[in-house]
């Protein structure tokens, strides 16, 4: 099973709590995180894009770096780890994204890929006059389908004459082209999102579910497999989890309860309000899960809380779910968390035995 790190491009990472570590996003912080991840043989690093935060006492995600420029910088200071940036497709023409991706492919030596998002949070785009109207909620994957067709044309042949409802290319050209086939990932959890990933993506991200229920996402992975069967493609799931680990289960649980006790209710209320804006996409979207009150303090990503041994065991359970190709990890404290993962958790994981072998050979 592949392991990735979801780098904190926004302030405070993924904990919406006054009791969580409070920090601003910087290049130096993210460089330290990704270089540590590479040292411990993580397979990939991904950054999201966020253009407007949730506010509240913690000013959650009110402070964000930009994904492509951040990952270009990180590509230049790493050598092995795969690097993924996220394109907010309402803000960037596909021909520009194709050229930026080709540039970072050159910087990274073929280690770069692109995560495509349609955009669900209206205020991110409305503030710039770029929101296309609420009908977009129902048509966003039609838009994204044309978008990725233009990308594939330009990366594959260097030119595009695509004509669609949303994009018109007139002998559009991009050169140089990427040195490797460009990986495209998506985070579709709705039926429409999974159908898109099945047709166009190489991997699909999904949320883990619950606290210490590592296989609860299995129905989502099964839906992705079923969607991919219809297109005859192999599109595996990468699952998002937060790791909160300590020497004992009790110590880790105490940290988790402390974070929950400091939940930033004002920021969470704003998230809930935004999640109700999309009435077109059904009840199975990512944002619906993010705003669920069960564990909104970390936007309801799957959460693994326990001793190092317990977390290793739960991650092995994740790996056992059919259709799972990898996990995307966040941490309550990224620098300490990645060290703990590399030194205390990963060596205990059966699904990462190949990493232990590599480490022994290097030593």
From Swiss-Prot:
InterPro entries: Luciferase-like_dom, Luciferase-like_sf, Pyrimidine_monooxygenase_RutA, SsuD_RutA_monooxygenase. It catalyses: uracil + FMNH2 + NADH + O2 = (Z)-3-ureidoacrylate + FMN + NAD(+) + H2O + H(+); thymine + FMNH2 + NADH + O2 = (Z)-2-methylureidoacrylate + FMN + NAD(+) + H2O + H(+). GO terms for biological process: alkanesulfonate catabolic process; nitrogen utilization; uracil catabolic process. GO terms for molecular function: alkanesulfonate monooxygenase activity; uracil oxygenase activity. FMN binds at residues 49-50, 115, 124, 140-141, 190. It is an enzyme of class 1 (oxidoreductase). Keywords: Flavoprotein, FMN, Monooxygenase, NADP, Oxidoreductase. Its EC number is 1.14.99.46. The keyword NADP applies. The keyword Nucleus does not apply. Coiled coil: none annotated. Belongs to the NtaA/SnaA/DszA monooxygenase family. RutA subfamily. The FMN-N(5)-oxide reacts spontaneously with NADH to produce FMN. Requires the flavin reductase RutF to regenerate FMN in vivo. This is Pyrimidine monooxygenase RutA. It comes from Klebsiella pneumoniae subsp. pneumoniae (strain ATCC 700721 / MGH 78578). The gene is rutA.
